[in-house]
Amino acid sequence: MNIFVLDKDPMRAAMMMCDKHIPKMIIESAQMLSTVHRMLDGTPVKRRSKSGKTIQTYYTFGDIRDDLYYLAVHKYHPCTTWTAESLQNYNWHYYHFVSMAKEFKFRRGKEHITFKKLGPIIAAPPINIKDIGLTEFVQAMTHYPECMVPGDAVQAYRNYYHKAKPFAKWEWGREAPTWWKGYSGAEVHSETA
């Protein structure tokens, strides 16, 4: 679960993502955006898990939306929390989701099923979301603290790609971003490229 903020512009960030991340992150973004809708506009209901072993909190709308949105997952993940924090954060994340779906269509020649199902539904932000402006992007990479750059999520996520994503390839019609080219696998940068 993450939002790869490889650029401050959500479309450019999507264009810079490696081939493997495009289909995967469309699903993760849809999960986070759906979760934000459920948590902010839904009603919490406690009931047994599917296994029956635990009591869990579910969020219901009490209408057709219960069948449309994904179930709430990773409610307290930093990226989900960031998305729920403000209208502008939600909108940035939604436009990134749309941009990833466009990238998928560009690179693979077909529409991603998750976007087909949820794209129009999650376009409207939650009713109960705060309008406080775009907040600082979260850096969800605590397992790679050497990649983090205080106040610069873009550089941090580029560092993270370099350090943790050596598998990254751009073979489906998009060239690797300039900040990736020439990367040897050893360096992690502290300033924006």
Language-model-derived ranges and their functions:
Residues 1-72, 76, 80-193:
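Sequence termini and other peripheral, non-core segments
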